[in-house]
Amino acid sequence: MNNHMDIPWHEYTNKDSKVKIENASLTEKSSVIGRIGLMLLACGTGAWRVRSSMNTIASELNITCIADIGLTNISYTCIDGIDSHAQSLSLHNTSVNTSKLARMEDFVYHFKDECKTCTCNEIHDQLDQIESIHSSYSPIILGLA
C-alpha cells in the first residue's frame, strides 16, 4: 500500500503559457525549486548539497529560498520580496542513484544558460526525463553498499 501520493508537478503550471520561468509566478518558480531539491534528496545526496542547489536556482530566479532539509523531507519557503510560498515535501523512499545525481548537478549548473528562457512546463518536462533515469544497481547491491 502506497501512503504517499504523487505530486502533479505540471499542475503548478499553465500548459499553454509562454511565460518564461524568470517571469513566472512565485508558485511556479517555487515548484521548480522544490522539485529539484526533492529529486536531489531522492538520489541520496546530503542536505548541504540539496540546499546549495535550491539556492542556486532561487538566486537565478531572483527570489530567496529558506529550506529545512531532513533525510526524507524538505520544508521550504520562497520569497520574492512581496509574497511568499511555502511547501513541505517528503519522499516515500530514498536510494543512491549516481546517474540521476550527475544529471541533476549538470541541470543545476547549466540552468542559467539553458533554462532561464524556458517555460515552467518545459522545465518540468526536462525534470521528468531526468526523473525517469533508473539506478545502475539493483536493490540488493544497494543494500550491501
What are these regions (language model features)?
Residues 1-118:
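Soluble N-terminal domains of membrane-associated systems
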Residues 32-35, 129-130, 145:
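Short, hydrophobic/aliphatic alpha-helical segments
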